[in-house]
Amino acid sequence: MDRIIRATAGDGAIKMAVINARDTVERARQIHGCAPTACAALGRTLCAASLMGQDMKEENAALTIRINGGGPLGGIVAVSDCDGNVRGYVGNPATELPLRSDGKLNVGAAVGRDGMFTVSRDIGLREPYIGSVELVSGEIAEDLTAYLLESEQVPSACALGVLVDTDCTVKAAGGFIVQLMPGAEEEIISRLEDNIFMMDQLTTILSEDGEEELFRQVLKGFDYHTVGEHPIEYRCYCSRERVEAALASIGSDALAELAQDGKDISVGCQFCGTEYTFTPAELEAIQPKPVEE
């Protein structure tokens, strides 16, 4: 079962969240037909969005990460609800590049580094809060760390990983965010840095030992306490009603033109691939939204 586990350590000076998202990322791979490198990029971004989304307190809140680094992968979009359930897509899911010299998938080259890492938080106000930073590496975790520090002023350490098996299915996927509370002592910071530097490979821990081992390695030398756990999944909220609302927003002239063409139209969801078909009569029945002055 995919899940997020949260813990605190160092007498409250450290907050850590771990995500295990193998099934979620595998579902995304199946929906979009992702090649291994594209799967790793999308999977890391889904994990990042889930970790950030589940930390929002407002009911029905949503968090969106958008990345476009100018690489062959195109843009990445990942959306999380306030429980960490996610959906997403990439511009070119067939993107596949040669492995790096260390044998790892070359996510940074696929994403590119000439662009922005943008986070939008919609908590039900008139306008969402939007923050952006320039991409650091295109490897996602480093970019997320930079965003949290520069845009939200939260010192953090992040790791994200996706292990793709020889048959192109997802063998492991997940990551963590460790955040320091204001006033954390230098000794705590140094110990955390050493622990993260010395830890085993992230996806190896998740596939062989599980989340608890990840907590033990990252928080070695600290007393830590689990404060919450809940399941997450790949979840799309599309519906025929939402598609009708989107069509209503294009205006009466455009709707009339589509109906007069005399052919059925199909509208596909970018997140889950579901197709919604409308006949000319159904298009005529859609009431256009009034234009706001």
Where are the model-predicted features located?
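Cys/His-clustered metal-coordination modules, chiefly Zn-binding fingers
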Residues: 196-293
